[in-house]
């Protein structure tokens, strides 16, 4: 019954459960297990037997909170980009399609930001829970997402300028010469 509850809580917390709650490693010669013998093989603890003690690794809660805080920051950025795209779609200039096009370009970018932040959050939470050594900074993800956002904003700006220029150029040429 307890294992079912632990698995349920672990699935809610976005991590997988481990059958070993203690520090995992080899039984012999692992630094995660403390040996009671002192230098020269003497027993320094005063106990009768030379037993090994399995010491659990402590996980600092600040690590989990920092991971969650990073996830929430990325989600807030993606929600702001999504709101900008929806604003452009709903309240943009109706005479040209440039605002609609800019909104349609930014909407997938915001969804991409959300998906990326969710996968990074789950991966980090799982690695933290499993006590795997890892780098906590993401070197490739933000760079790729910023490049995608920059390209999409550039495309939206180019199409907006092109539509505006095409509209003013075509209206001035279609009116014909004006002689007053």
Curated annotation (Swiss-Prot):
GO biological process: post-transcriptional regulation of gene expression
Classification via InterPro entries: DUF202 (IPR003807), VTC_Complex_Subunit (IPR051572)
Pfam family, one: DUF202
Localization of this protein: Acidocalcisome membrane
Disruption of the gene: reported phenotype: Causes an abnormal morphology of acidocalcisomes, a significant decrease in the amount of polyP and a deficient response to hyposmotic stress.
Top-level taxonomic group: Eukaryota
Vacuolar-side positions: 92-100, 162-180
GO cellular component: acidocalcisome; acidocalcisome membrane
Keywords: Membrane, Transmembrane, Transmembrane helix
Keyword Metal-binding set for record: no
KW Metal-binding (keyword) present: no
Transmembrane portions of the chain: 71-91, 101-121, 141-161
Membrane-side (Cytoplasmic) residue stretches: 1-70, 122-140
Recorded topology in the membrane: Multi-pass membrane protein
Purpose of the protein: Accessory subunit of the vacuolar transporter chaperone (VTC) complex. The VTC complex acts as a vacuolar polyphosphate polymerase that catalyzes the synthesis of inorganic polyphosphate (polyP) via transfer of phosphate from ATP to a growing polyP chain, releasing ADP. VTC exposes its catalytic domain vtc4 to the cytosol, where the growing polyP chain winds through a tunnel-shaped pocket, integrating cytoplasmic polymer synthesis with polyP membrane translocation.
Quaternary state and interactors: The VTC core complex is an integral membrane heterooligomer composed of at least the catalytic subunit vtc4 and the accessory subunits vtc1 and vtc2. vtc1 is a small membrane protein without hydrophilic domain. Vtc2 and vtc4 are related and have 2 hydrophilic domains that face the cytosol, an N-terminal SPX domain and the central core domain. The central core in vtc4 is the catalytic domain.
Family: Belongs to the VTC1 family.
Protein name: Vacuolar transporter chaperone complex subunit 1
Record organism: Trypanosoma brucei brucei (strain 927/4 GUTat10.1)
């Amino acid at each position: 019954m307890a294992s079912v509850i632990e698995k349920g809580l672990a699935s809610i917390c976005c991590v997988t459960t481990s059958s070993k709650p203690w520090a995992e490693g080899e039984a012999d010669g692992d630094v995660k297990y403390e040996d009671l013998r002192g230098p020269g093989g003497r027993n320094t603890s005063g106990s009768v037997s030379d037993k090994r003690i399995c010491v659990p690794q402590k996980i600092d809660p600040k690590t989990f909170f920092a991971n969650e805080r990073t996830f929430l920051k990325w989600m807030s950025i993606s929600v702001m980009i999504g709101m900008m795209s929806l604003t452009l779609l709903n309240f943009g200039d109706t005479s040209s399609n440039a605002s609609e096009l800019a909104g349609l370009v930014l909407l997938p970018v915001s969804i991409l930001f959300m998906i990326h932040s969710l996968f990074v959050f789950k991966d980090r939470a799982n690695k933290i829970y499993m006590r795997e050594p890892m780098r906590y900074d993401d070197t490739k993800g933000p760079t790729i997402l910023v490049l995608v956002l920059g390209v999409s904003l550039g495309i939206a700006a180019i199409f907006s300028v092109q539509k505006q220029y095409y509209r003013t150029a075509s209206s001035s040429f279609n009116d014909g010469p004006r002689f007053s």
